[in-house]
Regions:
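Beta-rich carbohydrate-recognition and catalytic domains
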Residues: 1-158
Length: 158
């Protein structure tokens, strides 16, 4: 299955139609559907707080890790902006895992852990980079992974 941001956001639109809101939290980041974990990438950029987390847009279980994206002006009311990162490249084909965000002037950088499955069946974690000039549309670096598995010390997990 090839993951893309467009495919993930379409899945969210379809699955959200079946979600019952009765017991959903009011003061917590929450996607329209799916699974979230590991809030990360918290930063202040262009007048808003941005928060990202690992997100599965296809089901309410841990799998298919993408990055979900929210913003807030007051840290109380959060707006959902869909998928920021999808595992759509060979170096992150098995998931876009946790990382962080850096606001540097007019650019917002996301550093994340790209996971790929090797020929030996093991999952390898490496550090990857994406950037945005508007805080919402991210482009992955042509130099990814910026810290590949080969450069990591023996026994490290990224």
């Amino acid at each position: 299955m090839k993951f893309t941001i467009q495919r993930a956001n379409q899945s969210v639109l379809e699955l959200a139609k079946s979600v019952v809101d009765t017991y959903r939290p009011s003061y917590h980041i929450l996607p329209p559907c799916g699974w979230i974990n590991d809030p990360n990438g918290f930063c202040f950029y262009q007048g808003e707080y941005h928060l990202f987390c690992q997100f599965n847009p296809y089901s309410a279980e841990w799998a298919n890790m993408h990055w979900g994206h929210w913003t807030s002006k007051d840290l109380l009311h959060w707006n959902w902006h869909g998928v920021a990162l999808a595992p759509d490249q060979p170096y992150d084909q098995s998931g876009c895992f946790s990382g962080h965000a850096i606001a540097d002037g007019d650019v917002l950088y996301l550093l994340y852990t790209g996971v790929k499955t090797g020929e030996d069946g093991l999952e390898y974690q490496q550090q990857c980079l994406a950037r945005s000039d508007d805080g919402f549309n991210f482009v992955k670096s042509e130099n990814n992974p910026v810290v590949p598995t080969a450069l990591q010390p023996e026994g490290s997990m990224a």
